[in-house]
Swiss-Prot record:
GO cellular component, one term: cytosol
GO molecular function, one term: ATP binding
Catalyzed reaction equations: tRNA(Gly) + glycine + ATP = glycyl-tRNA(Gly) + AMP + diphosphate
Organism: Citrifermentans bemidjiense (strain ATCC BAA-1014 / DSM 16622 / JCM 12645 / Bem) (Geobacter bemidjiensis)
Enzyme Commission code(s) on record: 6.1.1.14
Subunit details: Tetramer of two alpha and two beta subunits.
Protein name from the UniProt record: Glycine--tRNA ligase beta subunit
Length: 687
């Protein structure tokens, strides 16, 4: 009969960002442990607060099933000598398995006959396994940072204070560090700091709420959402939507309640982004706006307790925020005393990267690169691109950005407008940082897009040119994000700029800094972009369609994306399977291609003439469709060749004895392969 498992790890407050990942990791770890132990299980539930992590598994089998385990040993050729006697290899294998050599069996595999030890194992009770399994699971939860405490040889995100471990309502006995497992949990640190017994998950959830703890993060999130909307209504305002902040705050509290505070309207002269950033990033406050979206001089904060006198909490939060906003106002006023243009020179003293020079040198490189992009794609904005590129990093040496790095670019725009710069230039200064995250907002203007593309490409090519290449999960310069940003901007704007030309232009400007051969760097950078482009497209379209197109060419990203979309749509045809098989056959026969022209005089079968005539007619239609970038139409025209191709293969022996006839037939098939090869490599498609 299946039983339920319950585990709670109670500890000091865990950083908010650690909790959701720990919950996901606990689910993965228990699955791995149970699968390895051959223990069947049902639904898995994970919960978490700053002070506790919970794992509950329903329908856990009472014991392992009996099993027959096979351990493979040496090959038969190494296991017995010429007289059929066991060798030392066989004897050693038997000894290692704890059985007599006579008990070994020969097993036939794909690689031949091998010696094997086949042992029967009686399944153990799950209750016997859990005292070994659970402490291992706790110790294996991976945290970005973990710690030891006292003199115990265990690590966790924060010191553990209690562990509840129950299987079928009974305590699973084990120790982790200095903590023995038990059946008692604890309530809210401030509102109900007492222990209470736990029987199972349902009982635990009831008792937690009685002790002012909401273990379910989704429920806490909905409570917070309702609370901030309630308080915002009382304050005659609306909450500025911020799902990321809502998610973060939900892991900062166990029993949320909201209060409303205010700040002086005098601070509203500071750009709203600075005020919002200060409240969100530094204080975890929700901002308030009126019905027209205008920022109001108020905020909502989430407490971890319900207080008898909320005004005490409000005044404390207002005092902290007032100090923070006073700093922002001071920097804002001081920064206005120096024009943005005058700050550009200061970039010469800011090291961008030791091998790549200063921020000023970087600016000079991507300014020239942006200028070249503009000249090729929209010459009318070249002057504005140069101006925006010159100014876009100047706010990095301002007081405001020094104090609030999150508003870089935004302050550049504000200061540029204050100094009388063109609005298009000022907006481009802010836009050049976009997108800041996957799926994020993209530059609206060509000016901002060109500066953004140039800056990001200089970053990627610069790092690759001095050997700073992302490896595994390590990407300290966020090059993957920059590459995706470039790809998304190009696709969004429809820029027909060959990627290889763009990369080469950037590397030419980096030649004095590069420590690697530029040709080698160019190949690595293009391979890097190819990987990012394939991943991006594979999220939207079948991966084989993506590979089929990209393997032919992806230098023109807009064209490649359009071909992928067309091919993905084309494969929805009912007859796609037979089409793919027919075209794959053509590709496989003429892998290297034949460059000789087709001679109709060498045709010996009517099927050859029919295929040649069909190819001639279709080639013109395909060329016209490609000229219009109508790739689906081109593929549809190519599909009309199938009857002639099928007839050709049915009637004609391609590899004729006469070499001239054979080469002529291969040349005919080469023409077909190259026709659809201009769109995709059909050999990579699954039928």
């Amino acid at each position: 009969m299946a039983k339920d498992l319950f585990l709670e790890i109670g500890c000091e407050e865990i950083p908010a960002g650690f909790v959701p990942k720990a919950m996901a990791d606990m689910e993965l770890l228990i699955k791995k442990e149970f699968d390895s132990a051959r223990i069947e299980y049902g639904e898995i539930v994970t919960l978490g607060t700053p002070r506790r992590l919970v794992l509950a598994v329903k329908g856990v089998a009472e014991r392992q099933p009996d099993a027959e385990l096979t351990a493979m040993g040496p090959a038969k050729s190494h296991a017995y000598d010429a007289d059929g006697n066991p060798t030392k290899a066989a004897q050693g294998f038997a000894r290692g398995q704890g059985i007599d050599v006579s008990q070994l069996k020969l097993v036939t595999t794909e690689k031949g006959e091998y010696l094997a030890a086949v042992k029967s194992e009686i399944g153990r009770a799950t209750a016997e396994l859990l005292p070994e399994l659970l402490p291992r699971l706790i110790g294996n939860i991976p945290f970005k940072k973990s710690m030891r405490w006292a003199d115990f040889d265990v690590r966790f995100a924060r010191p553990i204070h209690w562990i509840v471990a129950l299987f079928d309502g009974k305590v699973v006995p084990f120790s982790f560090g200095n903590i023995d497992s038990g059946s008692a949990s604890r309530g809210h640190r401030f509102m109900a700091n007492t222990s209470f017994p736990v029987r199972d998950l349902a009982h635990y959830l009831e008792e937690c709420e009685r002790h002012f703890v909401i273990p379910d993060p989704n429920k806490r999130k909905e409570i917070i959402r309702a609370e901030i909307e309630r308080v915002a209504k009382q304050a005659k305002g609306n909450v500025l939507p911020d799902e990321a902040l809502l998610e973060q705050v939900s892991y900062l509290v166990e029993y949320p309640s909201a209060v409303h505070g205010t700040f002086s309207p005098d601070f509203l002269v500071v750009p709203r982004e600075v005020l919002i950033t200060s409240m969100r990033e530094h204080q975890r406050y929700f901002s308030l706006v009126d019905d027209e979206g205008k920022l109001l001089p108020g905020f909502i904060t989430i407490n971890n307790t319900i207080t008898e006198d909320p005004q005490v909490v409000v005044k404390g939060n207002e005092r902290v925020l007032r100090a923070r906003l006073s700093d922002a106002r001071f920097f804002f006023d001081e920064d206005h005393k120096v024009r943005l243009e005058a700050r550009v020179e200061s970039l010469k003293s800011v090291v961008y990267q030791a091998k790549l020079g200063t921020s000023y040198e970087k600016m000079e490189r991507f300014r020239e690169l942006g200028k070249r992009l503009a000249q090729r794609l929209n010459p009318a904005v070249t002057k504005e691109v140069e101006r925006a590129a010159t100014l876009c990093k100047a706010d990095l040496v301002s007081g405001m950005v020094g104090e609030f790095p999150e508003v870089q670019g935004i302050m550049g725009r504000e200061y540029a407008l204050h100094d009388g710069e063109e609005k298009a230039v000022a907006n481009a200064i802010a836009e050049h940082y976009l997108p800041t995250q996957a799926g994020g907002e993209l530059p609206a203007s060509d000016i901002g897009a060109f500066v953004s593309l140039a800056d990001k490409m200089d970053t990627i090519c610069g790092c690759f040119s001095v050997g700073l290449i992302p490896t595994g999960s390590a990407d300290p310069y966020a090059l993957r994000r920059s590459a995706l940003g470039i790809i998304n901007i190009i696709l969004d704007k429809g820029y027909r700029e060959p990627l290889s030309d763009f990369v080469k232009a950037s590397l030419d400007l980096l030649s004095a800094k590069a420590t690697r051969p530029l040709a080698e760097v160019q190949k690595d950078v293009l391979d890097f972009f190819r990987g990012r482009f394939v991943n991006l497209m594979a999220d939207r379209f079948p991966s084989d369609a993506v590979e089929a197109v990209v393997s032919v060419s992806f230098d023109d990203l807009v064209e490649a994306a359009a071909k992928i979309e067309a091919l993905a749509g084309f494969r929805n045809r009912d007859d796609f399977g037979p089409l793919a098989v027919a075209f794959k056959r053509v590709c496989n026969i003429v892998k290297d291609g034949v460059d000789t022209p087709v001679s109709t005089e060498l045709f010996q079968d009517a099927a050859e003439g029919e295929l040649h005539q069909a190819l001639t007619q279709v080639s013109g239609k395909v060329a016209a469709a490609l000229k219009k970038a109508d790739y689906l139409a081109a593929l549809t025209e190519i599909a009309t060749l199938k009857p002639a191709v099928d007839l050709f293969f049915e009637k004609v022996m391609v590899m004729a004895e006469d070499e001239r006839v054979r080469q002529n037939r291969l040349a005919l098939l080469t023409g077909i392969a190259r026709l659809f090869g201009s769109l995709a490599d059909f050999s990579r498609l699954s039928p």
